[in-house]
UniProtKB/Swiss-Prot annotation:
Gene name linked to the record: fbp
CDD domains: FBPase (cd00354)
Organism: Klebsiella pneumoniae subsp. pneumoniae (strain ATCC 700721 / MGH 78578)
EC id: 3.1.3.11
Entry protein name: Fructose-1,6-bisphosphatase class 1
Protein's GO biological process: fructose 1,6-bisphosphate metabolic process; fructose 6-phosphate metabolic process; fructose metabolic process; gluconeogenesis; sucrose biosynthetic process
GO cellular component term of the entry, any: cytosol
Length: 332
């Protein structure tokens, strides 16, 4: 049985520039995940369920667990002195860690994705993304360090808190998964070099918003529902409402996750930096594809910390199909 810590150290040789800092950074994220796992499991007992009464910068009501997870993960990263600063879905601006100007890395994170599901005991997750800073080491980080395209990511991953807690990550050399053993307090390797199945037959989308979708997406959904033995349709519809949980299932079983633009969110709803980029990096490393319907997600140049984007991620052939429908049926 190989632990996450042992695996990270073993793989450190894959980076010619490695000095151990990235290893320590991933270890800090691992610690934060353990703390969040522990408290999610007793959330109903310690009054951290439900809305906090506050709103984030996007105007969304923050759940108590959103704020709790944000603070715990931020503290775990700050304690190691190896991160120069963070950007979080729950923070209006970047957080600069004083005294860490020497650090080479910055972290972007969605501390608790799908937190509105926690009250009904549905799987939620943590998403993280790591970049090497672009401003000079020895100076405080600036927003420039965080507004990098996804193809500059050094590492990315997620933790899914479900029937078991799993941490899945990539450093650009494949996707690896670890299951948390609470009796030992360690993450143990369960799948190395994960890949999307060759063919997917599941589509994940909130069809309650169907009337608001672009024409090309509507046509694709109808295509998924049509019967055709040659392409193994109709596809199965599965939607949890938690990006991490939906992506994880599709990674294992094969499928596509869709979150298109709507009239109320013409640019899309998911955050490019905190959700789309890290999941796109993982998808490509697992042999899949991620797009906004027209452009590769990892090539998009961010313009703001909380920028949103349409998001289609999963099996190559399925993402290509939805891109073709969007191109063939443009909205007027």
């Amino acid at each position: 049985m190989k632990t996450l810590g042992e695996f990270i150290v073993e793989k450190q040789h894959e980076f010619s520039h490695a000095t151990g800092e990235l290893t320590a950074l991933l270890s800090a994220i691992k610690l934060g995940a353990k703390i969040i796992h522990r408290d999610i499991n007793k959330a109903g007992l310690v009054d951290i369920l439900g809305a906090s009464g506050a709103e984030n910068v996007q105007g969304e009501v923050q759940q108590k667990l959103d704020l709790f997870a944000n603070e715990k993960l931020k503290a775990a990263l700050r304690a190691r002195d190896i991160v120069a600063g963070i950007a979080s879905e729950e923070e209006d601006e970047i957080v600069v860690f004083e005294g860490c100007e020497h650090a080479k890395y910055v972290v972007l994170m969605d501390p608790l994705d799908g937190s509105s599901n926690i009250d009904v005991n549905v799987s939620v997750g943590t998403i993280f993304s790591i970049y090497r800073r672009v401003t000079p080491v020895g100076t405080p980080v600036t927003e420039e360090d965080f507004l990098q395209p996804g193809n500059k990511q050094v590492a990315a991953g997620y933790v899914v808190y479900g029937s078991s807690t799993m941490l899945v990550y990539t450093t650009g050399c494949g996707v690896h998964a670890f299951t948390y053993d609470p009796s030992l307090g360690v993450f143990c390797l369960c799948q190395e070099r994960m890949r999307f199945p060759e063919k997917g037959n599941t589509y994940s989308i909130n069809e309650g918003n169907y009337i608001k979708f672009p024409q090309g997406v509507k046509k694709y959904i109808k295509y998924c529902q049509e019967e055709d033995k040659a392409t193994q349709r109709p596809y199965t519809s599965r939607y949890i409402g938690s990006l991490v949980a939906d992506f994880h299932r599709n990674l294992l079983k094969g499928g596509i996750y869709l979150y298109p633009s709507t009239a109320s969110h013409p640019e899309g709803k998911l955050r490019l930096l905190y959700e789309c980029n890290p999941m796109a990096f993982l998808a490509e490393q697992a042999g899949g594809k991620a797009s906004d319907g027209k452009e590769r997600i990892l090539d998009i140049i961010p313009e703001s910390l909380h920028q949103r984007r349409s998001f289609f991620v999963g099996n190559n052939h399925m993402v290509e199909d939805v891109e073709n429908f969007i191109k063939a049926f443009p909205d007027a």
